[in-house]
Design a protein with these regions (language model features):
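Flexible inter-domain linker/hinge segments
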Residues: 1, 5-20, 169, 173, ...
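Active-site core of metal-dependent hydrolases
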Residues: 10-124
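Histidine-centered active-site/metal-ligand motif
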Residues: 47, 67-70, 266-268, 324-326
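Active-site-proximal loop/turn and secondary-structure-junction residues that shape catalytic pockets
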Residues: 48-52, 72-74, 102-103, 150, ...
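Hydrophobic/aromatic-rich, well-ordered segments within soluble, folded domains that form packed cores
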Residues: 65, 69-73, 289-303, 329, ...
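Short linear, low-complexity motifs centered on an aromatic residue
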Residues: 77-93, 112, 211, 218-220, ...
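Glycine-rich, acidic/polar active-site loops that bind/position phosphate-bearing ligands
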Residues: 124-310, 319-322, 329-565
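C-terminal amphipathic alpha-helical interaction region
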Residues: 497-700
Length: 700
């Protein structure tokens, strides 16, 4: 629970076995070997691993832990864990508390019980977890959590962390090659830095428990638009309600204890919608901590009689929830490689990294779109509340003008009338507020980072960052190959920047992404417009993308195909669950309520006409007819939906099954939801069986 007085520096990282704890508790030699392991990627010997395991166990027991778990991130998108106690026989009918080097380093899990895309059959159940020493262990709920990767018996990747770690390693290598070309010999490592802004909804637990769709699907499948939504713009940055503020205070403290750099909280645009944003950390740590954040959002909410909804579109008619992935590159000497430089060399270096990013996004736009595609996000992307489904980059007017000057071979003149020659002069300072105004862009440069805005609120940030890291590494590799062979570095650099910006300027768009004209303009430019998950998934097995990930040993072709199959199967299963839930709600509650209300209206009309012949019953008859007509349309739609479900192919039927579900199941589920919303607006509130949007959104 929330501590009344908080000394944040003392509280922060209290439940984390971090570097400070290691330095205090490990023998000096073991501590040095651990640091060497992190710096060079060398494996730990069994003796050192045993010393770390023993120190970790002793510390965890002091924090109240009795169990440990290998904490991993399978392809479900959420974390998984199996708890084992520290106890072992002491040989005298008692027990002692132990954690061996083997128990720290390696665990076993039933790989066939997690999504594997055919990599693991039920009779090939064995899978392994392996300790990730780059991510700190922590204690939560009297259990020591050890971050791990997850793979099959034969070594095939079954999780989201392993590709992320590999992509970071490849990106590090290629960034260093570029830095050496610019004379930087001090930096030894470059790490992608990530800060995910997490959006969510908070509603009262009582109304949540009255909606089967929220409980089973995480979102409402129907609802009439409330009289007041977000039209007045009064919720965004508005005063935080006391109950929500109490929740946020406790959430902060729980996150701080676990080393999560929770920094900013505020109300979002939609009623009951909020956001929490952390300080940046390396991509691997940021991914782990975002998973912890999502878990604690739900747990802390429950302690306050609230429910946290992480679905991308829990309510129709108001904004859904996303997760902005702020991505940058930092050296171990503290330099941000995406920050415009203050010297001629840094100026050219920044433009080269910018060119690599632009080229990568243009060449692999389908893969970027694919990595944020799943059923929940299909309801959000492309609406006038979230980035469009078309990938583009927003740079702002000043930076775009600099690129135009490079493309046209002219001198750039800044607002002070100073001319700019690339590699000779410094870039003018680009005020952040001039590059952070376009909220309709899926990828925006915001002064010293790129903000990838297409992520859904419930998804792991691992896959999007794997794609960003890998495409950046590939383009930097190509650039380094060219520049390392150049006789005249400056001339080669000038030509490379000119050619790259010229070839890939089509991906830059500073306009309104919500405008219908952009769809036509994007088509003219040859940009991909992949509208939903089913359209996106073939990108996973496109030869260009398979070659990219196999070339850098991020994923094998088999692992890419497995992910393709997993996502398609998930699409079918989610669609079936939502359709079945809606059918149950309609048949058992909504149609009976509508029928009973129509009957009541007709009885009232009958009594009025028979008791006082001059008394009009037009209102009752009209309402009864409208309710009956809508009820029959809903009944027919649900009958067709039920038949479509009965005829549906198996969920693991690949792209053909997914197309069937999109055409026959999803469209009918949506149509039924619209009809229910119209019925809800007609039926007596006392007779309607479920809380309305107004009841839910304004319940806190």
């Amino acid at each position: 629970m929330c501590e009344k007085t908080t000394n944040v520096p003392d509280l922060f990282g209290k439940m984390v076995f971090g570097e400070q704890q290691m330095q205090q508790r490990l023998p000096a030699a073991a501590y040095q070997k651990w640091q060497q392991c992190l710096a060079q990627g060398t494996p730990l010997d069994r003796t050192t691993a045993g010393e770390i395991a023993n120190a970790m166990k002793d510390w965890a027991i002091e924090k109240g832990a009795t169990h440990y778990t290998h904490w991993f991130q399978p392809m479900t998108g959420v974390t998984a864990e199996k708890h084992d106690s520290f106890i072992t026989r002491d040989g005298k009918d008692g027990v002692v508390m132990e954690l061996s080097a083997k128990e720290l380093s390696k665990g076993e899990a039933d790989a066939s019980s997690f999504p594997s895309g055919g990599l693991r059959a039920t009779f090939e159940a064995r899978g392994y977890t392996a300790w990730d020493p780059t991510s700190y262990a922590f204690v939560k709920d009297e259990t020591l959590y050890i971050p791990t990767i997850f793979c099959s018996y034969s070594g095939q990747t079954l999780d989201k962390k392993t590709p992320l770690l590999r992509s970071m390693r490849v990106l590090d290598r290629e960034c260093i090659r570029i830095l050496r070309l610019f004379g930087n010999t001090e930096a030894q490592h470059v790490t992608p830095q990530v800060g995910p802004e997490q959006e969510y909804f908070l509603i009262d637990e009582k109304v949540y428990r009255q909606r089967e769709d929220l409980k089973l699907c995480g979102r409402t499948l129907f609802g009439a638009r409330p009289s007041k939504g977000q039209e007045l713009d009064d919720h965004y940055y508005g005063a935080i309600k006391p109950r929500v503020a109490a929740f946020m205070r406790e959430l902060d403290q729980e996150l701080w204890k676990l080393g999560v750099l929770a920094k900013t909280e505020h109300n979002e645009v939609a009623p009951a919608q909020h956001e929490i944003a952390p300080i940046y950390s390396d991509a691997n740590s940021a991914c782990d901590k975002n998973q912890l954040t999502m878990e604690l959002l739900k747990k802390v909410a429950a302690r306050h009689g609230l429910v946290c909804l992480l679905h991308e579109k829990p309510f129709a008619g108001v904004n859904g929830s996303g997760k902005h992935d702020n991505w940058s590159l930092a050296t171990d000497t503290g330099e941000n490689l995406l920050k415009p430089g203050s010297t001629p060399s840094q100026n050219a270096q920044f433009l080269l990294f910018l060119a690599a990013f632009i080229k990568g996004v243009d060449e692999y736009q389908e893969m970027l779109r694919c990595c944020v595609s799943y059923p929940g996000n299909d309801h959000r992307l492309g609406g006038n509340e979230a980035p469009p489904a078309i990938i583009s980059i927003f740079l702002g007017d000043e930076l775009t003008a600099i690129l135009d000057a490079i493309i046209q071979g002219t001198e750039y003149v800044d607002i002070t009338k100073k001319k700019l020659t690339i590699g000779v002069d410094t870039l003018p300072e680009i005020p952040q507020d001039t590059t952070d105004r376009n909220r309709t862009s899926p990828l925006a440069f915001t002064g010293n980072k790129f903000e990838f805005r297409m992520l859904g609120s419930s998804q792991s940030i691992a896959s999007p960052n794997v794609v960003l890291n890998t495409i950046m590494a590939e383009e930097l590799r190509q650039f380094a190959d060219i520049l390392e062979k150049a006789d005249d570095f400056q001339s080669a650099l000038q030509k490379l920047l000119h050619d790259t910006f010229t070839a890939h300027q089509r991906i830059i768009f500073n306009g309104n992404g919500y405008d219908d004209a952009w769809v036509q303009e994007a088509k003219r430019r040859g940009l991909a417009n992949l509208r939903d998950t089913v359209d996106c998934m073939p990108a996973y097995i496109d030869k260009k993308n398979v070659d990219l990930f196999t070339k850098h040993a991020i994923l094998t072709e088999t692992e890419m195909r497995a992910r393709y199959e997993i996502h398609l199967e998930n699409y079918c299963k989610v669609s079936a669950i939502e359709a079945s839930t809606l059918l149950d709600m309609v048949q058992r509650h909504i149609l009976p309520a509508a029928s009973a209300y129509a009957d009541r209206l007709t009885q009232t009309a009958f009594h009025k006409e028979n008791s006082v012949p001059a008394l009009s019953a037009r209102m009752e008859k009209t309402l009864a007819q409208r309710v009956t007509d809508l009820g029959e349309k809903l009944f027919d739609t649900c009958e067709a939906l039920h038949a479509a479900l009965s005829d549906a192919p198996a969920a693991d039927g690949g792209i053909d099954a997914a197309r069937y579900y999109r055409c026959e199941i999803v469209t009918r589920t949506q149509k039924a939801g619209e009809l229910i919303g119209r019925l809800e607006s007609l039926v007596d509130a006392k007779a309607w069986p479920y809380p309305t949007y107004a009841d839910i959104l304004f319940s806190v």
